[in-house]
Swiss-Prot record:
The protein's name: Pyruvate dehydrogenase E1 component subunit alpha, testis-specific form, mitochondrial
Gene name tied to this protein: Pdha2
Protein EC: 1.2.4.1
Keywords tagged on the record: Carbohydrate metabolism, Glucose metabolism, Magnesium, Metal-binding, Mitochondrion, Oxidoreductase, Phosphoprotein, Pyruvate, Thiamine pyrophosphate, Transit peptide, Tricarboxylic acid cycle
Transit peptide extent on chain: 1-30
Gene Ontology molecular function, alphabetical: metal ion binding; pyruvate dehydrogenase (acetyl-transferring) activity; pyruvate dehydrogenase (NAD+) activity
């Protein structure tokens, strides 16, 4: 009788697991719902207390973060491939290796908050809500791109995301302006203004620091310190590489930018600081890019292959999260491999769209220059050629 009952139950459950929803339900029963994780303490400047040194990671959060980071990694590697196949032309700056920054920052703020960054923007485009399809299509200059094929790699925009900016450091005072708008409107929102260590010595950055401190603007200045500004190491370009201290009277913190949980908790802390009316704060994210500065830079003339390999093998952000997930029984290798396969298909489908979607028509070149009805004559257009639509 017992053998018969066992056989029946085995048959029932084997049939159930063929259905994805039930399979997911059954698999989740053997995993922990959450785990308390220790994270590295941040270095503080002009702060008595900083972010916590432990945090709770739920299973749902872990799988979401893992998938998002894998999407960004595969999307950037696909962009590398499309560039080499000449589907992508012009400038192209990839962020593989820095995924914990993109995902951790978004996890620490609200969708209604604001983000502005430099030309290394693809990952932030995705975390701000743009699809892989629209990002890759923008890279290939197609109509289905997030900027209708007119912005390319460096000029992508989305809801509460202001680029993608091509001039080194130029986005920082713009971010201070967005923060000024938040304070003026009294909406309780903050702006994350990101820049690299190469831009950290720009004069306009310090001007933005000053005005933000003077007016107590809700701006989180974030230096993504990946150790190199183009091909120059930060030790050769900066008298001090303590970027979290460069705000002078503005408090700051230095964060392990390869650990998504460190980034998330530091971002929450910084955003709360700004929302409380204390003014701006500076965050330095210690991170690393695997590619060169851009696709025209092989990235090995100013650093060794051994250096890159060492970072990949010891500090890769996706690897660190995967190990944390498995060690805390939030998932297993089999489930994570299923996510990997799903991500691979999503990126491949997006790449297919990005290489077959039509390019914008020539007649469309003067469209979308103005928000509302523009003057009939459009500056920069051929003086003998007038387009039917300019809006």
């Amino acid at each position: 009788m017992r053998k018969m009952l066992t056989a029946v139950l085995s048959h029932v459950f084997s049939g159930m697991v063929q259905k994805p929803a039930l399979r997911g339900l059954l698999s989740s029963l053997k995993f922990s719902n959450d785990a308390t994780c220790d994270i590295k303490k941040c270095d503080l400047y002009r702060l008595e207390e900083g972010p916590p040194t432990s945090t709770v990671l739920t299973r749902a959060e872990a799988l979401k973060y893992y998938r998002t980071m894998q999407v960004i990694r595969r999307m950037e590697l696909k962009a590398d491939q499309l560039y080499k196949q000449k589907f992508i032309r012009g400038f192209c700056h990839l962020c593989d290796g820095q995924e914990a920054c993109c995902v951790g920052l978004e996890a620490g703020i609200n969708p209604t908050d604001h983000v502005i960054t430099s030309y290394r923007a693809h990952g932030f485009c995705y975390t701000r809500g743009l699809s892989v399809k629209s990002i890759l299509a923008e890279l290939t200059g197609r109509k289905g791109g997030c900027a209708k094929g007119k912005g390319g790699s460096m000029h992508m925009y989305g809801k509460n995301f202001y680029g993608g900016n091509g001039i080194v450091g130029a986005q920082v005072p713009l971010g201070a302006g967005v923060a000024f708008a938040c304070k003026y409107l009294k909406n309780g929102q903050v702006c994350l203004a990101l820049y690299g260590d190469g831009a950290a010595n720009q004069g306009q950055v310090f001007e933005a620091y000053n005005m933000s401190a003077l007016w107590k603007l809700p701006c989180v200045f974030i230096c993504e310190n990946n150790l190199y500004g183009m091909g120059t190491s930060n030790e050769r370009s900066a008298a001090s590489t303590d970027y979290h201290k460069k705000g002078f009277i503005i408090p700051g913190l230095r964060v392990n930018g390869m650990d998504i949980l460190c980034v998330r908790e530091a971002t929450k802390f910084a955003a709360d600081h700004c929302r409380s009316g204390k003014g701006p704060i500076v965050m330095e994210l210690q991170t690393y890019r695997y590619h060169g500065h851009s696709m025209s830079d092989p990235g090995i003339s100013y650093r060794s292959r051994e250096e890159v390999h060492n970072v990949r093998s010891k500090s890769d952000p996706i690897m660190l999260l995967r190990e944390r997930i498995i060690s805390n029984n939030l998932s297993n290798i089999e489930e994570l491999k299923e996510i990997d396969a799903d991500v691979k298909k999503e990126v491949e489908d997006a790449a297919q769209f990005a290489t077959t979607d039509p390019e914008p028509a020539v007649e469309d070149i003067a469209n979308y220059l103005y928000h509302q009805d523009p003057p009939f004559e459009v500056r920069g257009a051929h003086k003998w050629l007038k387009y039917k639509s300019h809006s």
